[in-house]
Amino acid sequence: GVVGNQGAYFDERDRHLIYIDGSLAVMSFQLALETLGLSSCCINWPSIFQLEKRMEKLLGLEEHERVVMFLSVGYPDPEGLIPYSQKKSVDEIRSYNNCQGAR
């Protein structure tokens, strides 16, 4: 799991920074994993008090530490498909307002 240390921030207003900083660090880590031929998937961890307490106990976290997310890592299926959505052309989505008579 990815754990943030809220004790590293000095002000209450910074309490959400562990999620931003943790996510940025994981993004770089995921890119590094790709260079090694590994795939990864971020797994959201909900901020629910009862779950937080259970996870603190399971991982032996300090009171100021919070789970940011989990990350699964493994080798990709060489025959796995990659999702693709065909984008609409500009002509399909562009429209013009009829401005005749407007003042």
What does each model-found stretch correspond to?
Residues 1-103:
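Acidic, surface-exposed loops and disordered segments
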